[in-house]
Amino acid sequence: MTTVADILKYIESIAPPYMAESWDNVGLLCGRKTKAVKKILVALDPFRSVIDEAIALGADLIVTHHPLIFGEELKAVNEDTETGRCLLTLMEHGIAAINAHTNLDMAPGGINEVLAQKLALVNIRVADPSGTDAEGRDWGLIRMGEVPEQPLENFLNRVKTLLGCEGLRYVNGGKPVKNVCVGGGSCGGFVSEAAKLGCDTFVTADVKYNQFRTAYELGVNLIDAGHFHTENPTMPILAEKLRREFPGVEVIFSENHRDVMRFYSSFQIVGNAVPGIPCGRLSKKPYFRKLCRGDH
């Protein structure tokens, strides 16, 4: 009989808790370790839609990257908060919840290593190792590697296509792409370190205004590919690892969990013009020249 404790032990073997940031909340956040597990649902987030899916499937355990309890001082488990309502639902249906968050970001074969592989980087390595694991492998947050030198536009298309993004936010640092750093999720604060490491391009998500400005001043191509799209590629891989480790357990990758963020633009390119705005007026600025040419 496979138990929650068995699943937890395995997950912590590939993403040890000591790799997690001190402020993080990882591991078993809901449920009993002794509970038998016959069916697992894997998803990036423990959102309501994922919990409802787990109930419909009859899952015993949800395994996610992001923690259900995070960044809040939870003083009561009741219906006053969404976290409380989710916890109550899980407990009422006997569903346990495990997450591997920043420990999975840091771990060999984790979030950022998979992101680097997904973008077809070569010579992938930990940019600034935090330590070595029991097998002597470096671990740490940021990964770096190389691609054949190419124009930024080509690499943007690669990122958008390979990660399945609806759109990208980016700053053109004025250099072709060759040496690339990646950090899934909210790693925009590492742009200065990326520059010091000699990277001309940094792919991450949740980038702030001042981080884009810093990248521009440092001459780094900074690409925001979205939190979901930079982290979710690891989750089906984790699901497959669980299937191999526990062949007697049914492991299902969530079909309902999707990125809820969408891009909206009020501009609609028709032919060579932005409707209602003469191209002569727009052509004074490089960005709008691109709009007028239709190669945005």
Which residues fall in each region the model found?
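Hydrophobic structural segments
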Residues: 1-271, 276-296
